[in-house]
């Protein structure tokens, strides 16, 4: 079970809603993934109508919605978007995203910390998308964020855990859940994140752009379950030397 703020989730896989060929395919993939927390960009939905093509099927699916502030370039813009989302969707949960450069979509650490502190004070449950910076993640935790969401690689790049060394430090020092977000490209990346101690992963592009998104979503579900189970089972330690799994000479000596 995964506990974040006032909610509990059975699944350690969070999913997004972008880049799918259709709303139907999006919903089928989310169901196949087993995900119970789904992000959606406020700029992509009509907040005035719950029969929006993206919003309506998500509400019907019964998942927890995590609106994000993707598109915001400053703390002020993100705070404004957060209040719109809370008013329209009736949730104080928020994925905080601030990336001023559309080419790289890297999170702005200064604006993110500033917005996070304000939003927490205003009663939001803040899950910030941030760089894999252990110092920043600790500061975000200290201002009251319910979890931290450091990137594995740039958004949509499918490069995997390029920031692994920093992620390990973040995980080791965190007292709130760590959700690896962005860059996860194949199920094995997700399994590795859970094995190394992450509490969850958020996957969007890798599922949405696959030739078969529904089966890819299933693969990610199984990978996350496997990674979590492997961590709980306690992997053996690594070694630079070979260690025989059975005696090498006893049977020869016995037959001599």
From Swiss-Prot:
This is Thiazole synthase. It is an enzyme of class 2 (transferase). GO terms for biological process: thiamine diphosphate biosynthetic process. Keywords: Cytoplasm, Schiff base, Thiamine biosynthesis, Transferase. GO terms for cellular component: cytoplasm. 1-deoxy-D-xylulose 5-phosphate binds at residues 156, 182-183, 204-205. Catalyzes the rearrangement of 1-deoxy-D-xylulose 5-phosphate (DXP) to produce the thiazole phosphate moiety of thiamine. Sulfur is provided by the thiocarboxylate moiety of the carrier protein ThiS. In vitro, sulfur can be provided by H(2)S. One of its GO terms (molecular function) is thiazole synthase activity. Pathway: Cofactor biosynthesis; thiamine diphosphate biosynthesis. The active site is at 95 (schiff-base intermediate with dxp). It comes from the Bacteria. Belongs to the ThiG family.
